[in-house]
Design a protein with these regions (language model features):
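Hydrophobic/aromatic beta-strand patches that form the interior of the parallel beta-sheet core
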Residues: 74, 165-167, 194-196
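N-terminal secretory targeting modules
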Residues: 1-76, 81-82, 126-129, 228, ...
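Catalytic His-Asp segment of secreted/periplasmic serine-dependent ester chemistry enzymes
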Residues: 176-273
Length: 273
């Protein structure tokens, strides 16, 4: 078994020369193009796409990496998360695999919260080895806040006691306030849940497309960096981009999704020494 990471580790996630500031206790290092991820005794270089200056908010509930004993990560979402998967630009795996995470992205366009339950019914029951999860569902919202909260709560309960990172949505319409409020409530109910406030990050100019919902090309890299910061280094260094089972983006509106790659990236292992 690969030994747990220790000491000082330097990992370059993304190329670029943006400026990153990390919120929290106010004493994090801030350099041009470099951010400090707390959580282990190591240094990690995080770079944003050129032209971005973003302060990442504190991760409520704490970083995921220090809470887990394994590195298998299940990510569940809609078109926004899907756009960062290996069938498109692969931004998410490019960011997380060097940190030691074995990442499965189960995300499809136009999916509502109940999609998360369906994913877990298939992947959680068949594979008990997941160590943590990221859930980003709520952009597609039917307008019933109680029903939405029930679905998110059910997802969290199915995943318990695994650490879960819930992600708020961008505020592209007034009803998203109900979505994000429900996410905050559910996050506050469970000790195993942490919160990434994408609502704040997505306000930065250039992160979203003109529709105010989906990610711009550089925004996909920003999103991957934000998730990487919330996760932190995994306990093991054998990162990999795992095969996805849910890949149907046919419900997406025209020009919503990026251009797909001709050949989906094969599952890869990290070359982190």
């Amino acid at each position: 078994m690969i030994k747990k990471l220790f000491g000082v580790v330097a990992v370059a996630i993304l190329a670029g020369c943006g400026s990153l500031s990390i919120g929290g206790n106010g004493d994090s290092d801030v350099l041009s193009g470099v951010g400090r991820i707390p959580g282990y005794d190591f240094g990690t270089a995080i770079t944003l796409p050129e032209g971005f200056e973003i302060e990442l908010p504190e991760i409520k509930g704490g970083l995921i990496g220090p809470k887990v004993s394994g590195n298998r990560l299940l990510m569940i979402g809609d078109s926004i998360l899907a756009s960062t998967s290996s069938r498109y630009g692969n931004e998410m795996c490019d960011a997380l695999v060097p940190l030691g995470w074995q990442v499965a992205i189960e995300a499809e366009a136009s999916r509502f919260a109940e999609f998360g339950v369906r994913v877990l019914d298939q992947r959680l029951n068949a594979e008990a080895g997941w160590d943590a999860a990221v859930v980003f569902l709520g952009t597609n919202y039917e307008g019933n806040k109680d029903s939405y909260a029930k679905q998110i709560r059910k997802i969290v309960q199915k995943l318990a006691p695994r650490p879960v990172l819930l992600v708020t949505t961008s505020m592209f319409r007034n009803t998203q306030r109900e979505v994000n409020a429900a996410i905050l409530v559910v996050a506050g109910e469970s000790e195993n849940v942490s919160l990434l406030d994408w609502e704040i990050i997505s306000k930065a100019k250039g992160v979203l497309n003109n529709d105010g919902v989906h990610l711009s090309p550089k925004g996909r890299s920003v999103f991957a960096v934000a998730v990487a910061r919330a996760l932190d280094i995994a306990p093991y260094r054998d990162g990999a981009c795992l095969e996805s089972k849910f890949r149907d983006d046919s419900a997406a509106a025209k020009d919503v999704m990026p251009e797909p790659v001709d050949t989906v990236n094969e599952p890869t292992a990290s070359s982190t020494p």
